Structures are given as C-alpha cells and as structure tokens.
Swiss-Prot record:
Keywords: Cell membrane, Membrane, Transmembrane, Transmembrane helix, Virulence. The chain crosses the membrane at residues 7-27, 822-842, 869-889, 903-923, 928-948, 979-999. Homodimer. Interacts with EssB. Component of the type VII secretion system (Ess). Provides together with EssB and other components such as EssC and EssE a secretion platform across the cytoplasmic membrane in the host. It is a multi-pass membrane protein. This is Type VII secretion system accessory factor EsaA. One of its GO terms (cellular component) is plasma membrane. Gene3D superfamilies: abc type-2 transporter like domain.
Length: 1009
C-alpha cells in the first residue's frame, strides 16, 4: 500500500515539474524579448517611440463659449510626424506600458481646460500635464521620451498664450459693441416712451372733460323733467278723479240685469229636476236587501259555533287512516334484485352507446365543427393584425400609451387600447412559435400615422375673412399682430386701400370718420410650429385700431377710441381623424376575436366517455330504487306535522266570526242611514223667494255713471298731453345718459390700452436694465486681477507666460542604466508555483504519516483543537518564511527604491501566505478536486496573460484571481494606486485560510484521490 502511494506521489511530482518548465518557457518566450525590443528602439529612429495619450479633460465655458483644450492638445500632437501618438483610455495605456506596447503615457487631467482659462483669477493655479515612462526602458529611450514631452509642452504653451491674447482682444471688441447697443436701446426706449405712452397720457384728461360736460347736460335735462312733471301734478284738480259712491257700484254694469234673469231661470229648472228625481228613487228595495243579508250573517255565526269539534274529529280520522296505509307498504326491491338490475342495465346501456350510429355521427360532426371554427378564428386574427398590400385598412399598429394620447385619446381610453395592443403582441408570439419563419407575422411599425393630421392646414391653409365698419373721430393707426404659428397670405382693405397681412403698424388717413375694413386671406400652418399649434388648435389674428403721435390743441376735447378686431378660429375640426377611427375599430375587432380565441384555447378534443355516462345513469336509477324506505319515513313525518297543525288550520278557518260581527254592525248603520234619506225625500222642498223689483235701480245707476265717466275723460286728455311733454324730456335725458355711457366706455378702453402699453414699456426697460447689468458684471470681471494694487500681478503674468507644466508620475523602481527589469507577471507566477509545491508537500506528508499531532489527545478533549491550531500555524509560518525570502530576492531584482521596500516585502509575504494556506486547504480537504481548482486558476492566468493587448483587457482577466495579484504589484511598482485596500483584503484572506486549515474534516472512506 505504501509503495502504491509513493508511485502516485512520483507521478504528481513529475506532472508539476513538467508544468513549471512549460510555464517558464512560455513566459520567457512572451516577455523575455522586452529588453531586446528596447535595444532595437535605441538604434531605430524616433518614430519607433509609441506614446499613449489619455484625455480625461472635461469641457468648460469661458465668455459664453465652450472650451476643450484637451482636444486642441490632441490635434496639436496629430501634426507631429517624428513620433507615433495614439489616443486611448487609461486602462489601455497602462496595459500598453506593462506589455511594451507604449513607451510613454501622457495624461491630460480632467480640470485641464478649467485651470487653463484662469485669466480672471488673482493667483491662478498651475496646470500639470502628467506623463509616465515604461518600467525597464533603456536610459537613452527614457531621455528621448522626456525630450518629446518637453517639446510638445513648449509648443502648446505658445498656442495657449496666443489664445489668451485673442480672448483679451475679443473681450475689448465685445465691450465696444455692447456700449453701442446700450445707447441704441436707450434711444429706442426714450422714443417709444414719448410716442407710445407720454402723448396718449397728455390727451387722457380730455376724456374726463367730455364726461363732465355730458353729465352736467344730463343733470339739467333731468331737473327740467322733474319740474315739468311736478307742475302738471300741482295743476290737476283732485275732484276730477272722485266718483259719486252713493249708488251700489257693483250693480252699475249694464249686463247685470240679463245675468240675473239667467240665474233665476236656472234655479227654477233645478227645483223642477229635484222634484222629478226624488220620486224615481227606490230606497225600499235597498233597505230590504240589506236586512236579508243581516239575517244570513246571523245564521252563519250560529253554524260556526256548532261545527268546530266535528271538523277536528274528521281531520284526525283521515290522517290516522292515511298513516296506517303508508306503514303497511314495503319496498318491492330486494338487495339482490337491485344488484342484478344494475348489471343488466349497465350492459344494456353499453351495448346501446357502442352501436348507436347517430351518436357517433354527432360526435364526429362536433369535432369537425370545432376544428373548422378554430381554423377560421386563427385566420381572422391573422387578418386583424397583418397589413395586406395597398388596400388593407384593418390592421394594427405597434402603438404605445403615449402614442394614443398624442392621437387625441384620454388616459382611460389610452390604457384600454394599449392593453389590446399587448394582447395582439402576445398572440403574435404564440402564432410565430407554431409557424415556420416564412409565415411569421408582425405588427406594423408606427410612425405617427394616426396622429392628428395637420397636412391640410400646412398645404391648403384656412381662409381668413372679416368685414367690419368702424366709426371714430380720432383713430389714425392700425396695428396688425399675426399668429406666429402661421404664414399669412392676403390683404387688409381699409376704405379700398390694401395692406399685407403681416406684423406691422399702418398710419391711417385722419380725414375719414368711418373706416370700412375687409380682411381676405389664407393662413397656412408652419411645419416647425405644428407641435405648439396642437396645444390649443386655434389661429389668432388681431387688428388693433387706435391713436398714435397725436398733437392736438390744448382746448381740443375730442375723445380717443381703441377698437380691437380679433379673429380666433378653432381648427380642431380641420384635423383629420379617419386613420385614428380605423385603428380603434381594428383594435376593437381584434379584441372581440381574441376573447373568443382565449375561450376556445386549451379545449382538447377528448373521446366521449361512455363509461362515465353509463355509470351516472345507472347510479341515478339505483338510487331511486334504494330510496323507497327513506321516502316512506319522510311521508310519515309530513303526516305527523299535518296532525300537529290541524287545530291551527281549523281555528284560522273559523276565526272569521269577529269579521262577521263587524260586517253586521256596518250593515245595520247603513240601513238606518237609508231610512233617514227616505224620510227626507218624502218632504217637499221649500222654494226660495227672489225679489225682482230691484232691477229698476240699474237704469238710474247707469245714467249717473255716464256723467262721471265723461268728466274723467276730459281730464285724462289733458293728462295725456302733459305726459307726452314729459316723454320728450325723458328721451332727451336718455340721449344724454347714452352719450355719458359712451364716454365712460371710451375712457375705460383708453385706460386699458394705456395700461397695456405701460406694461410693455416696463418689460422692455426691465430687459434692457438686465442686459446692461449683465454686461457691466461680465465686463467688470475681464482682467480685474491684472494688477495687484498699482503693480502688475506677477502670478497672473507668470501663469499666462507659461501656463502648462509637466509632471512625471514616478515609478517605485529605479532605472539602473541599461539593466533589464523582470516582469511582475513572471514574479506572481513563480510565487504561485512555489505555493503549489509547498501545499503538495504538506498534503503528501499527511497522507503518508497522518495528521500532525504535537499534543496527545489523551490528556484533554481540547487537545485536538490545539493540534489543528498548531498545524495551521506551521502552514502559515511556512508561507511567511517563503514570502520573506521571495520578497528579498524580488526587491533586489526589481531595484525597488528605499522608501517603498517595506510595503513591497509586506505585500509579498501576505500574498505568499494566502497562496500557501488556500492551496494547502484545497489539497487537504478536497484532494484531487482541489488540485483541479489550483490548476484551473493557473490556466485562467495563462489565458489572461495571452489576452493582454493594447485594445484592452478581456473577460478572462476579470475572473482570474492571479490577474488581480499581478495588477496589484504592477500598480504599486508604477506608483499608480494606493495599496491600503489591497493589504486589508490580503490580511482577511490570510485569516480565512488559517481558520479553514483548522477545520479539516477527514472521511473514513476516501473516494477522490
């Protein structure tokens, strides 16, 4: 057994040695000629030096212009013929420095443009252009690269000085132009204030004067009116309207006499009718019938008292007899008879269903109909989605919710139709899965085909027509304001003179007091204004008639009118919506078909289950046969319930006695009432006495009334004349009040127009003040720090003379003449291979000798744990010693500078301890699988090394653990990144590896060896 184990150990050792030799050969082949490349670059021309440019500059703004000096620097280098420049990312540049692709990396920092444009700063910061040379270069190559960077930097500084001088000259030129613009704006504001606001305000008091004159005139007319009216009332005689009331006024109407005769005749007729009808009423018959009914009610009441007990006895006897009959009945079906009948019935039904041709034909017909229906439904859904060439309008666009809202639908409707589009997509995917590629279907791409169509407004436009007649004494100007969303074609005629429809102010002929205005033209929507127009869908055209630049005499009291003629056309009806209607109709049709499709989907054509049907029918019959006993018990319970409720039923039937008594009392009262009526009819009615002698008074009263009415008529004629005179005065007052109302309206319109003009002028003046303030603020900043007191600002002068300086990103390594430097890649590879050998030694020892027990387990139960701690400590200490030795050798080989050696040794020790602890744990715990994982990590590292190209790093480099270690050492040796985080991670991994080696679980039966 021991011999066999040593054979296994020997084979594994040979495999490791072969792998190590192969790896060393591969690395030497890949990286060993780096020094040779460096020596050849010395002998070749300078254009063999490759320089990587990393542009991290962010654009800035200076004097309102975008500045990107990083791009300008790159363009400057593009004109350089002696060297090869490439613009790459920082990762690509660092990889190129690592594998020899680039000799120099120049980094343009992100604040390069911002710091370069510090012309206004008092103490500007220097700009640093960072660069780094590759590790391990020859001294001559390094000197050449330094010279290249210095030359490029000097040329770029010269260009920056030219830019600074150009910027200063531009600022002075802009200041000159802005001062002229300020003067022009001030002159325009003053002129507009004089013509647009000051002159109308001077004329404004005239409106108050006209209003005062009209109000005084109206007040005089009203006073005259009231005086005339009072005079008319005072001159009237109060006796004129007094009527003699000694007579009965209610009888003065001439028709009263005839009306009295008519009423008298009607009363006589009514008395005759009453006498004739009372003899025809037969009250005796009604009275006798009611008495007979009362007698019958008495007989019925006596019968109820004697028959109640007989009813109860009869019901009880019948129920007892029925109970005996039911109890004597027995079930005609025995248990055996039921089972035989079940068997025979089952066989009979099976034979009938199996040989029933009609049933089979019906099932086949149903199956064929279902298949045909499904085929037709799929074809209909296909036609609903797919657009046929040229003629088809019933297809579905691939529209979103936002597309529906843009087409004019509200949010609820948009959600509804968006859900239908999703159903169409779902069905499309299901259909394409079942069909070959050539028969696949898709929704039609949407490109605003159903959006609100404004093509007619763009191509044909909308007619603009208006006719208006304006009367005014002081209108002398027309201001036209057009809708900015439209192009207007046509003209405006004012008293026959034509003017184009455009934004303008037109001076009118003041000799005319009436203006006939005719607007006739076409407004076409601008293509670039379509989106703004759809917000309100209205076209506006304003014609404002008013007064401008009026110079009147001081005593001129004419009023000023402002007439606003505005045309607003809502063009919502001109937007085509046919395509939207067709699309919504197509979606609704698809929704209906898809619902039928989902209802029928999943129904499989299963064979008709004859057995289930037969069992159901047989079970129903057998249940009826077996339920005889249960039915018998239920009937007996019903009979018992009827017997219990019989007394209540009889009582309900016989309880009508109370109602009968009440009816008898009502009939007796009715008989008494009819007896009284009969007595009343037997008496003769008394005729009323009517005094007809009063009719003579009507003639005397009418004669006196005629005299009084004649006298009133004369006085009313005089009153009518006075009223007409008052009406004339009232009309005059009304005219004065109307004129006063017009003056007030004109005053209001003029005040409103003046307010609008004042607001416009105020906005313009505020804008001018803002522009002037901005210019003054910006101009104040220009070279405000060019002097420090009375002396020149030396810091700014030094910055502008030499703004950009170079900064060398120093390496940790020291270049010793022509000595080559080993690559960190080979260094990491050697450490990992050494850790694999160490791990295998511990693993082989444990397999041959067993677990290391420094303390016997017999003395304490915790001694096993202490042995594990000591074992992990031995493994970790071995890694520490190996790391210290390897670190000292590598430090001398890399020629690490004095200030960086301690950190370098610490990094190597921690890395070696991680490698040894992790690899030892893998071999001790999972054995062959652990060896596979170790070799896999090594293989990933080889693949990652092979993929390191100037174009960037591959995915393999990101998942390779050894690549991260390689990058850590490379970045440290090049002084690129801090290593604090890396040291913390390595320390954590050392602790994890130490703990894992403490808890090795040994299995009794090992399978993976």
């Amino acid at each position: 057994m021991k011999k066999k184990n040593w054979i296994y150990a020997l084979i594994v050792t040979l495999i490791i040695i072969i792998a190590i030799v192969s790896m060393i050969f591969f690395v030497q082949t890949k990286y060993g000629d780096q020094s040779e490349k460096g020596s050849r670059s010395v002998s070749n021309k300078n254009n063999k030096i490759h320089i990587a440019i990393v542009n991290e500059d962010q654009p800035t703004t200076y004097n309102g212009k975008k500045v990107e000096l990083g791009q300008a620097f790159i363009k400057r280098l593009a004109n350089e013929k002696n060297y090869k420049f490439e613009t790459v990312t920082r990762n690509v540049a660092e990889s190129g420095l690592k594998n020899g692709g680039y000799q120099v990396m120049i980094v343009i920092p992100e604040n390069f443009s911002k710091l370069a444009m510090q012309l206004d700063a008092k103490t500007p910061s220097k700009i640093s252009l960072q660069y780094k040379t590759a590790v391990g270069q020859k001294e001559e190559v390094a000197k050449n690269t330094e010279k290249v960077v210095s030359n490029v930097l000097n040329d770029f500084n010269k260009n920056l000085v030219e830019i600074y001088l150009t910027s200063i000259i531009d600022n002075l030129h802009n200041a000159q132009k802005n001062v002229g613009a300020i003067m022009t704006r001030e002159h325009g504001v003053n002129s507009k204030f004089s013509n647009y606001l000051l002159n109308p305000i001077n004329d404004f008091p005239e409106l108050f004067t006209d209003t005062l004159v009209n109000s005084i005139s109206a007040n005089k007319d009203i006073t005259k009116w009231f005086q005339t009216y009072n005079k008319s009332l005072l001159s009237a005689n109060s006796d004129t309207f007094r009527v003699n009331t000694d007579y009965n006024v209610s009888t003065l109407i001439e028709k009263q006499n005839s009306l009295f005769d008519e009423h008298n005749t009607a009363m006589d007729k009514m008395l005759q009718d009453y006498k004739s009808q009372k003899d025809s009423v037969e009250l005796d018959n009604y009275i006798n019938a009611l008495k007979q009914m009362d007698s019958q009610i008495d007989q019925q009441s006596s019968m109820q008292d004697t028959g109640k007990e007989e009813y109860k006895q009869t019901v009880k006897e019948n129920l007892d007899k029925l109970r005996e009959i039911i109890q004597s009945q027995e079930s005609p079906f025995s248990k055996g008879m039921i089972e035989d009948y079940r068997k025979q019935l089952t066989e009979s039904l099976q034979d009938e269903l199996a040989n029933n041709k009609d049933l089979q034909d019906a099932l086949n017909s149903i199956k064929m109909n279902n298949a045909q229906f499904a085929e037709n439904l799929e074809k209909q859904l296909h036609d609903d989605i797919v657009k046929e060439p040229d003629t088809d309008t019933t297809f579905i666009y691939n529209m979103s919710k936002q597309d529906f809202i843009a087409a004019g639908l509200n949010e609820d409707e948009a959600n509804k139709y968006e859900a239908i589009v999703k159903e169409a997509k779902r069905y499309k995917n299901e259909y394409n899965l079942k069909k070959p590629l050539a028969e696949h279907i898709n929704l039609t791409d949407y490109d605003n085909q159903v959006a609100q169509d404004t093509s007619s407004l763009i191509n044909d436009g909308v007619k603009v027509q208006r006719t208006e007649t304006i009367k005014s004494n002081d209108i002398n100007q027309l201001t036209v304001a057009t809708d900015p969303h439209f192009n207007f074609e046509g003209d405006i005629k004012i008293n026959g003179k034509k003017y184009d429809i455009k934004d303008q102010s037109v001076q009118l002929d003041t000799s005319n007091k009436e203006y006939k205005v005719e607007v006739n033209g076409v407004a076409k929507l601008k293509k670039d204004a379509e989106k703004d127009f759809l917000k309100d869908k209205t076209m506006h055209l304003q014609l404002l008639f008013g007064q401008a630049n009026r110079q009147d005499e001081p005593n001129d009291k004419k009023t000023t009118s402002v007439v606003d003629v505005t045309l607003n056309h809502n063009l919502d009806g001109r937007l085509s919506k046919d395509a939207l209607s067709q699309q919504l109709s197509a979606l609704s049709r698809f929704d209906a078909h898809y619902k039928m499709y989902t209802d029928t989907k999943g129904r499989e054509d299963k064979p008709f289950d004859n057995k289930r049907l037969i069992d159901m029918m047989v079970d129903q019959v057998i249940n009826d046969m077996e339920s005889f006993k249960d039915d018998k018990v239920a009937v007996l319970h019903q009979i018992d319930s009827m017997e219990e409720n019989s007394d209540k039923l009889i009582d309900d039937i016989l309880n009508n006695k109370k109602n009968t008594t009440k009816n008898k009392e009502d009939i007796s009262k009715l008989i008494d009432q009819l007896e009284n009526v009969k007595k009343t009819f037997a008496e003769e009615p008394q005729e009323p006495k009517i005094d007809k002698g009063k009719n003579d008074e009507f003639n005397t009263m009418s004669s006196n009334l005629d005299k009084e009415i004649s006298r009133i008529s004369e006085k009313s004629t005089q009153l009518l004349s006075d009223t007409q005179e008052s009406k004339t005065i009232a009309d005059s007052v009304s005219g004065q009040l109307n004129q006063l109302d017009n003056n007030v309206n004109k005053l209001h319109a003029t005040g409103r127009a003046l307010g609008v003009r004042a607001n416009d002028l105020n906005r313009q003046m505020a804008k001018n003040d803002k522009d002037n303030e901005l210019f003054a603020k910006e101009f104040k900043k220009v070279l405000q720090n060019s002097k420090d007191g009375d002396r020149q600002n030396q810091a700014l002068k030094a910055f502008m003379s030499n703004p950009v300086q170079k900064k060398n990103l120093e390496n940790v390594l020291a270049n010793n003449g022509n000595t080559d430097v080993i690559s960190p890649t080979l260094f990491v590879l050697l450490m990992y291979l050494l850790s694999m050998i160490t791990a295998y030694i511990f693993y082989s020892y444990e397999r041959a000798k067993g677990q290391m027990n420094f303390i016997k387990d017999d003395y304490s139960s915790k001694n096993h744990l202490w042995n594990n701690v000591i074992t992990s400590g031995v493994i970790g200490t071995t890694g520490l010693v190996e790391g210290l030795i390897v670190g000292l050798i590598a430090m001398n080989k890399f020629h690490v500078l004095a200030g960086y050696r301690a950190k370098f040794i610490l990094m190597v020790i921690l890395t070696m301890m991680v490698f040894v602890l992790i690899n030892t744990y893998l071999l001790r715990q999972v054995k062959s699988i652990g060896m596979f994982l170790m070799i896999a990590a090594l293989g990933l590292y080889f693949v990652a090394m092979n993929n390191l190209k100037a174009a960037g790093q591959g995915v393999t480099n990101k998942i390779s653990p050894l690549s991260y270690i390689d990058n850590m050492f490379f970045n440290y040796l090049n002084a690129e990144h801090p290593i604090g985080l890396a040291l913390v991670i390595l320390t954590v991994l050392v602790i994890i590896g130490f703990v894992l080696n403490m808890f090795i679980k040994h299995f009794k039966k090992e399978r993976l060896i």
